[in-house]
């Protein structure tokens, strides 16, 4: 039942000769070799004739004809292989013509040396890795490879290789690239390696051994800074070489990494001489971009002069979605078993804004960093640092001593309570302005500010951290809003249990959070008391969506369960609230209506909103959710002459005017397929203008989705896109089932 694997012929183990023939019919190789999850049945015939068993000495001829064979649950068909081995020299010819893998292979080589010679010609016409069960994603490829290496010794590499007719494809893309060519030449005095491709060029000339290059560079650095864990006995031959490298964002690279779009070519030139302990390196990148992160005019240099390795990294400017850099640099030197560094950040007027300078030196099994006492600048201000400060690190923890940063009445002090890296680490704030740090991140606008006083302590930092804090933040500011005064008390003296007391007061705010969070189980037992939350204090949190916000939110919530399945119980109610969305422009007034939370989700019980004319809209019903990720709806929305749009005519609006409606809407279904049944009437008080996209909108097509971007009204396009992006961060909306009857009063005006 496991097949028939007969072998016939002659075998003389004493003389090491053989003349064998094997024929199988559905032999279960997986069963025989106890690898049935990998191998299956095979049908083949094979011959072996010759002498010897050592590949370097045997004189043998082999032939294999695999009619079909199963590997990883795929049945291969039509494999041919012929091999001829004669005293260490060999030739091989093979082909496979299968619907999902087709190739022709010719090769020869000499195996007598430690590093064999090799000559290969491979024509790969088809390779479908998904069909062959080698990958879970669709990937097919095609290429032709020709290689001829008289020596494959990496320290005396000689030969050439070319890969051309290169094509890749997956489920959505066909990718092509130009040929790749590698040439290596070796003599007693020099090694040359040249690589050419669409995405990269390399020229490497001089005296070097590939297997020793990394050790040679480490040895040079070791002359100036003792690398931890590196023995002095590593033997490296003399090296003297030059390298020129260019990296380009080719179409193939951009198809694989589209976030690099906008990146320019990166070039590097390196010269290295181990005997003279010389290094000269320059790397230039006019623009490096990854998604929304951009750096302009990156320039990195390193050289050896005056018994040191001098280095500098400079950028003209750089930015991320929330971060901006101007004329920034990191520079210094490595010498005398120390790494000296200075970080300089300038503002857009080229004025020094942040400077941090210090020295790193090896210390036992780790390292020690010391701040320069006379060169610290934070947000334009000079700060004092004690002379005997240091931060020491090893695998067991961090030891900080005498690290107190001071400017006038501001200070932040870090100190370990003991003299070992496992000692508790304490931080003490005194009149410390948060903007000193946050303006490093957001230099053009104030992100966060406030005055911090208090203490915090961390124990077992690198093993099982235990954290306690007693901090007060006076006049906490977020962007343009002053939120109030914040008290943060956290006790983590019991492992995996955080006891918290958080209090927000001032600016008409009175909010308190008390309870515990158990990190090991991600469980919580928290109580939120909103005695009064001033909505105006938090307008900046929703600045892109909310034009204005005032009034109060009050109530209480108990939070239990875990982060994957939180349970909220309680209610929140508004008090004289008014919210004006940016996109509609109509103020929505909410008197004293509530949102109730229970085990099933949250509930609106005749939740009423009034427009600026006092007309009413009501939401009633439930939103059911087991985890605040999946939702099911049972809600109604009714309105009587309610003004949903009241926006002035502005250059950046795609609609403006007044839009008044009567509405009777039922919403059911879930987040995957909301079901909406609506009756809507547009009333006579309507005077509404909708600006259609211009005649030449920018159209971007991505995998069947066409996006229209109105260039004449970019701000509203951005607002609408940000709204869609906010939806995409929640459960995916797969569709909508909408049934609507819409009537229009004859006196309603539309443009």
Regions found by a protein language model. Give the residues of each.
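Interface amphipathic segments
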Residues: 1-457, 461-556, 564-664, 668-751
């Amino acid at each position: 039942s496991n097949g028939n694997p007969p072998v016939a012929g002659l075998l003389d183990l004493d003389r090491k000769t053989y003349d064998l023939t094997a024929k199988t019919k559905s032999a279960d190789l997986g069963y025989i070799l106890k690898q049935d999850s990998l191998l299956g049945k095979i049908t083949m015939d094979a011959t072996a004739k010759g002498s010897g068993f050592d590949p370097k000495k045997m004189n043998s001829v082999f032939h294999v004809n695999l009619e079909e064979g199963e590997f990883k649950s795929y049945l291969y068909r039509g494999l041919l292989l012929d091999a001829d081995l004669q005293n260490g020299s060999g030739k091989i010819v093979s082909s496979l013509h299968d619907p999902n893998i087709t190739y022709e292979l010719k090769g020869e080589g000499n195996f007598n040396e430690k590093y064999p010679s090799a000559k290969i010609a491979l024509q790969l016409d088809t390779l479908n890795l998904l069909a062959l069960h080698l990958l879970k994603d669709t990937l097919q490829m095609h290429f032709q490879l020709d290689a001829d290496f008289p020596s494959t010794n990496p320290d005396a590499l000689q030969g050439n290789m070319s890969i051309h007719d290169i094509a890749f494809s997956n489920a959505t893309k066909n990718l092509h690239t130009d040929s790749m060519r590698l040439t290596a030449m070796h003599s007693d005095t020099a090694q040359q390696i040249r690589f050419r491709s669409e995405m990269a060029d390399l020229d490497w000339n001089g005296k070097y051994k590939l297997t020793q290059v990394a050790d040679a560079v480490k040895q040079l650095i070791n002359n100036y800074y003792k690398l931890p864990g590196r023995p002095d006995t590593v033997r490296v031959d003399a090296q003297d070489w030059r390298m020129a490298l260019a990296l380009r964002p080719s179409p193939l690279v951009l198809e694989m990494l589209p976030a690099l779009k906008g990146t320019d070519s990166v070039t590097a030139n390196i010269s290295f001489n181990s005997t003279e302990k010389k290094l000269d390196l320059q790397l230039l990148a006019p623009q490096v971009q990854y998604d929304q992160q951009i750096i302009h005019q990156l320039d990195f240099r390193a050289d050896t002069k005056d018994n040191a390795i001098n280095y500098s990294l400079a950028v003209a400017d750089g930015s991320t979605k929330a971060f901006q850099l101007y004329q920034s640099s990191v520079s210094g030197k490595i010498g005398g078993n120390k790494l000296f560094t200075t970080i300089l950040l300038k503002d857009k007027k080229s004025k020094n804004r942040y400077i941090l300078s210090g020295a790193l030196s090896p210390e036992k099994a780790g390292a020690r960093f010391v701040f320069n006492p006379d060169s610290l600048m934070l947000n334009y201000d000079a700060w004092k640092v004690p002379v005997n400060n240091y931060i020491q690190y090893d695998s067991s923890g961090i030891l900080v001593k005498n690290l107190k940063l001071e400017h006038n009445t501001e200070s932040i002090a870090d100190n370990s309570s003991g003299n070992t890296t496992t000692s508790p680490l304490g931080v003490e704030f005194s009149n410390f302005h948060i903007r000193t740090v946050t303006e490093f991140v957001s230099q053009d606008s104030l992100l966060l500010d406030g005055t911090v006083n208090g203490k915090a302590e961390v124990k077992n930092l690198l093993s099982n951290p235990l954290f306690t804090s007693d901090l007060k933040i006076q006049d906490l500011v977020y962007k343009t809003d002053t939120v109030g005064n914040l008290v943060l008390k956290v006790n983590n003296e019991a492992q995996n249990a955080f006891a918290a007391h958080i209090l927000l007061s001032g600016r008409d705010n009175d909010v308190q959070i008390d309870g515990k969070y158990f990190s090991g189980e991600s469980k919580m037992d928290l109580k939120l008391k909103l005695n009064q939350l001033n909505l105006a204090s938090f307008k900046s949190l929703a600045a892109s969506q909310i034009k204005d916000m005032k009034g109060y939110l009050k109530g209480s919530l108990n939070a239990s369960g875990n982060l994957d399945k939180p349970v909220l119980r309680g209610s929140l109610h508004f008090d004289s609230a008014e919210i004006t969305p940016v996109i509609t422009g109509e103020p929505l007034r909410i008197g004293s209506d509530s949102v109730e939370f229970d085990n099933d989700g949250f509930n609106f019980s005749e939740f009423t909103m009034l427009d600026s004319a006092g007309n009413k809209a009501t939401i009633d019903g439930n939103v059911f959710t087991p985890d605040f990720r999946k939702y099911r709806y049972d809600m109604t929305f009714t309105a009587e002459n309610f003004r949903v749009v009241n926006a002035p005519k502005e250059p950046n609006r795609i609609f403006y005017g007044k839009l008044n409606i009567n509405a009777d809407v039922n919403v059911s279904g879930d987040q995957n397929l909301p079901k909406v049944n609506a009756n809507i009437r547009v009333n006579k008080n309507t005077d509404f203008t909708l600006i259609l996209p211009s005649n030449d909108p920018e159209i971007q097509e991505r995998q069947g989705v066409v996006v229209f971007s109105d260039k004449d009204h970019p701000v509203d396009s951005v607002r609408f896109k940000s709204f869609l992006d906010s939806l995409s961060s929640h459960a995916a909306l797969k569709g909508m089932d909408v049934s609507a009857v819409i009537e229009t009063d004859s006196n309603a005006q539309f443009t």
